[in-house]
């Protein structure tokens, strides 16, 4: 037997595993590294976050990824070169963290790598009938495994698409394991580049997980254009200095994506600076000030989250919303959400013992655990649009 397969077999039979979860989002702020101790699988899973760190990306790393990110026309050679290069950068960060934490690589059972999303193309967006849903994350798992000496699970989204999903959001598979509570309706709201939420009913209703529209992506892109060297609107200072323009806000809300039924997925391929410019032209607000533009797109992100949650809740008047992702650090965005969802109680996932900045990396560690230890019945959620699959490709160090 291949020794890697024998080791994997042994790992699957252990009561618990030490797994590193990695998340690198579209904001390109850095690599989230979550060292997790995970016992059991499925609804019997117990997770403890042992260590967590976000390693900031260099300007060189950001620029290299932005050369190919979310663009229809790119340098194919550069894409080919970036696939292993990103893995080697991530491997170096992992090795450095383990050394800093005084943990041997051999003490880690698995790495769960989301990779770096380069393009997300659900059929609803590309609208080419002979092609289905598609997505591409680069950062090759074999290179990561060899450079760290740790079995690596990667490329999770492809199996979801192969089984009939849209490849995103995948949060539901971990959310229902970690956060479901019988008798209590909960929403797990993640505000990353794109905002998404998982509705976890306390009773017999269907679980729902869906993207709802832009989270930080439009705001961050606009800030980077207007203030080179700046990644985001720190403390919402620029947005707070402006006034919402109702004409531009209305134009931003006109896209057909918002009329489509849940679950659905989207990305910066739609919500980008071109989208903003088109909305400005439609609303005759091309000369709108930077501050007023930021105030408006901040409100736009908030409104689409609010509308989606209200649509999901129907006649429910009180619910707990556990928030995570970079958007929770945007005070104006969170203020809008709380003002327009007055019946909801807003909490951080920290209230459940999960660092909100680490949540996505933790969720991929859970997916890796399911890939190795679970069968389909353990990951079955029995809700429309959520395929019952264990996801991830396995790479051995040697």
Language-model-detected regions and their locations in the chain:
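Non-transmembrane, aqueous-exposed alpha-helical and coiled segments at domain scale
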Residues: 4-6, 99, 105-106, 248, ...
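Phosphate-binding/catalytic loop of phosphoryl-transfer enzymes
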Residues: 15-18, 22, 128-135, 142-146, ...
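Conserved ATP-utilizing enzyme core subdomain
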Residues: 16, 30-49, 54-57, 204-302, ...
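Glycine-rich phosphate-binding/hydrolytic loop that grips phosphoryl groups
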Residues: 28, 295, 299, 350-398
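Conserved non-catalytic scaffold segment of RNase H-like nuclease domains
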Residues: 45-85
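Short beta-strand-loop/turn "lid" adjacent to the catalytic site in phosphate-handling enzymes
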Residues: 72-138
């Amino acid at each position: 037997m291949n020794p890697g397969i024998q080791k994997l077999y042994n790992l699957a039979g252990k009561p618990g595993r030490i797994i590193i979860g990695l998340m690198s989002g579209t904001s390109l702020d850095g690599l989230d590294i979550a060292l997790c101790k995970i016992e059991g699988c499925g609804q019997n899973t117990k997770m403890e976050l042992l260590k967590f760190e976000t390693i900031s990306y260099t300007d060189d790393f950001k620029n290299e990824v932005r050369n190919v990110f979310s663009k229809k026309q790119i340098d194919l050679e550069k894409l080919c070169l970036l696939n292993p290069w990103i893995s080697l950068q991530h491997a170096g960060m992992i090795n450095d963290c383990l050394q800093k934490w005084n943990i041997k690589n051999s003490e880690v059972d698995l790495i769960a790598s989301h990779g770096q999303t380069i393009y997300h193309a659900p059929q609803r967006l590309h609208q080419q009938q002979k092609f289905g849903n598609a997505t591409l994350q680069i950062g090759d798992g074999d290179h990561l495994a060899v450079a760290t000496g740790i079995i690596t699970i990667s490329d999770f989204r492809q199996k979801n698409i192969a089984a009939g999903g849209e490849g995103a959001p995948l949060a539901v598979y971990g959310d229902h394991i970690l956060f479901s509570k019988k008798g209590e309706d909960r929403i797990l709201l993640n505000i990353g580049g794109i905002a998404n939420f998982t509705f976890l009913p306390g009773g017999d209703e269907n679980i729902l997980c869906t993207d709802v529209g832009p989270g930080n992506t439009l705001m961050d892109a606009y800030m980077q254009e207007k203030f080179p060297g700046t990644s985001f609107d720190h403390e919402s200072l620029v947005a707070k200095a402006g006034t919402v323009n109702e004409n531009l806000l209305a134009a931003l809300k006109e896209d057909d994506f918002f009329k489509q039924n849940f679950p659905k997925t989207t990305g910066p391929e739609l919500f980008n600076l071109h989208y903003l410019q088109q909305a400005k032209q439609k609303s005759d607000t091309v000369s709108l000030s930077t501050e007023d533009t930021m105030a408006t797109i901040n409100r736009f992100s908030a409104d689409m989250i609010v509308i989606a949650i209200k649509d999901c809740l129907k006649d429910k008047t009180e619910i707990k919303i556990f928030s995570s992702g970079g958007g929770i650090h945007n005070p104006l965005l969170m203020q809008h959400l709380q003002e327009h969802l007055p019946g909801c109680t807003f909490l951080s996932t920290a209230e459940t013992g999960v660092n909100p900045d680490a949540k996505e990396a933790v969720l991929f560690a859970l997916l890796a655990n399911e890939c190795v230890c679970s069968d389909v019945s353990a990951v079955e959620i029995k809700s429309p649009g959520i395929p019952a699959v264990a996801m991830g490709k396995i790479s051995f160090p040697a």
